[in-house]
Amino acid sequence: MNFKVIFAAASLLATQAFAIAGIGFHYSPNVGTTLKTGKQAPLKVNDQVYPVEFSHGDFDYIQGFGFKAWIDILPFVDVEGTFNIQFASYNATLWADGEPHRLEIELGGTPFAKATPKFIAMNADISVTKPFSIPLFPIRPYVGAGLTIYWNTFILNNAFVEGVLERSGKDLSGSSAKEIADALAKNVVDAAKDKGLNKSVGFHLLAGARFKLPIIPIAAYANVKVYLGGEYDSDIDAGHVAFELGGGFAL
């Protein structure tokens, strides 16, 4: 009896344990992407120094989530498509007579409401991978590469605020520091709403594995991706390495 059970289990594992297609959801942190602190400094336009200062905070990493769909039925290669959203928060402050005026920004084109400024990076990947088989184990490792389309937001920095100040400078002449800060805060928020997403194209390399037991229509997967190319705001130090850890439904 024990021999029959062992034989049946081995036969089951030896059968095709991988889906012809699947869709999943995953956690996706990006390693090494950082923003350095923008130190408090006076705002200056055309050699005119205003009695208002600006500063912004920093972050050490970004994290997020994503979705993936894949096809395993093709001969020799698999194909997968991924969409990731990663983000981090930082503060931005106008200073008037030593008093902080915190800025809350609604970044157009992103699924986030008005809040402290956020850096948001989105990417869509299409990948072609070469799978490998491990006999008697329901694991499908693979390596591959593909095309990436990037979208990301700008950083609310000194240059952006000075640009807004330059466009509204005449209306603020003769005002007190507090009046300038109050008016400038509103103008910055309005300008940020109209600021679109940066878009660029690049490539990526990936290595990963999918795990799926026979018959059960559930799969788990893990990927590591190295991104090549892509354009970011000059204040962003992009890490170019992301992980995907998740699972989903597979047929």
What kind of feature is each model-predicted range?
Residues 10-12, 16, 110-111, 115, ...:
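Short stretches within intrinsically disordered, low-complexity N-terminal or propeptide regions
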Residues 22-24, 239-251:
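Outer-membrane beta-barrel "beta-signal"
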Residues 27-31, 68-170, 216, 251:
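Gram-negative (and chloroplast) outer-membrane scaffold detector with strong preference
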